[in-house]
Amino acid sequence: MSEFNITETYLRFLEEDTEMTMPIAAIEALVTLLRIKTPETAAEMINTIKSSTEELIKSIPNSVSLRAGCDIFMRFVLRNLHLYGDWENCKQHLIENGQLFVSRAKKSRNKIAEIGVDFIADDDIILVHGYSRAVFSLLNHAANKFIRFRCVVTESRPSKQGNQLYTLLEQKGIPVTLIVDSAVGAVIDKVDKVFVGAEGVAESGGIINLVGTYSVGVLAHNARKPFYVVTESHKFVRMFPLSSDDLPMAGPPLDFTRRTDDLEDALRGPTIDYTAQEYITALITDLGVLTPSAVSEELIKMWYD
């Protein structure tokens, strides 16, 4: 048997299921690790999970989201180790319940859509930054409920995620227009609310997300427009950044080294940023509608209850 590679396993799960989020793929990979590695003691299991988690985080750029999944799985393991006297039963329990957790987490978007649909009214114009599966699930659910609304989608450079969301909304028959990121300030007074997803939700209630989210949050705040974060609770992560400078980045936010004459290839910069809690109206999650200050309470429940 070839040596187990946590990174390759993680990437394979993402490739096989395009709807899977990074935290869930991380948990799936760690469950697979336990099944293959078969540690002989609790201490060996914890060390194996820790070392594999560190390896995975180091190997994946923008690892905030998968870090949340690794944290959740470690918490799950630590809380369940003492429940069984028999080690073999303990291992089997962790594997089976890890898979059960993954199954439930995959359904969280449906729950978010059911909760969040009350935030969309007839004739709303909704600004969306980037492509979030949770946001799309909510918008699709609202359209299926025959709520008449329109969407303004940012292009979301450099990833151009907005193009993907624009195409999906068009296919669903939802009226939508695509704008460049720099046009948000020009249209913010014409929209009714803003929806964004999240790569991770920090302990403070602020969010780590696609670059440009912070700019949209500031503009929405100044224009007194509601700014809603639509996200799964398994993206709550034990981090407390004060600004985007505190985020784990693949490279420096500003790089003046010239590497190419192609302007498109020369386009560089951060891929994620941090939006502080004061710009966020509420978080629409599978746990319900939360204020930013409630996130730390939920993390405490997750880790210490």
Curated annotation (Swiss-Prot):
Any coiled-coil regions, as ranges: none
Residues modified as N-acetylserine: 2
MF-aspect GO terms: enzyme regulator activity; translation initiation factor activity
GO BP terms in the entry: cytoplasmic translational initiation; positive regulation of cellular response to amino acid starvation; positive regulation of cellular response to heat; positive regulation of translational initiation; regulation of translational initiation; translational initiation
Keyword Protein biosynthesis listed: yes
Pfam families: IF-2B
InterPro entries, sorted: eIF2B_alpha/beta/delta, elF-2B_alpha_N, IF-2B-related, IF_2B-like_C, NagB/RpiA_transferase-like
GO CC, any one term: guanyl-nucleotide exchange factor complex
UniProt note: phenotype after gene disruption: Inhibits GCN4 derepression in glucose, amino acid, or purine-starved cells.
UniProt-annotated location(s): Cytoplasm, Cytosol
Swiss-Prot/TrEMBL keywords: Acetylation, Activator, Cytoplasm, Initiation factor, Phosphoprotein, Protein biosynthesis, Repressor, Translation regulation
Positions bearing Phosphothreonine: 291
Main function: Acts as a component of the translation initiation factor 2B (eIF2B) complex, which catalyzes the exchange of GDP for GTP on the eukaryotic initiation factor 2 (eIF2) complex gamma subunit. Its guanine nucleotide exchange factor activity is repressed when bound to eIF2 complex phosphorylated on the alpha subunit, thereby limiting the amount of methionyl-initiator methionine tRNA available to the ribosome and consequently global translation is repressed.
Any further remark recorded for this protein: Present with 8970 molecules/cell in log phase SD medium.
Protein family: Belongs to the eIF-2B alpha/beta/delta subunits family.
Complex and partners: Component of the translation initiation factor 2B (eIF2B) complex which is a heterodecamer of two sets of five different subunits: alpha, beta, gamma, delta and epsilon. Subunits alpha, beta and delta comprise a regulatory subcomplex and subunits epsilon and gamma comprise a catalytic subcomplex. Within the complex, the hexameric regulatory complex resides at the center, with the two heterodimeric catalytic subcomplexes bound on opposite sides.
Protein known as: Translation initiation factor eIF2B subunit alpha
Species for this entry: Saccharomyces cerevisiae (strain ATCC 204508 / S288c) (Baker's yeast)
This protein's encoding gene: GCN3
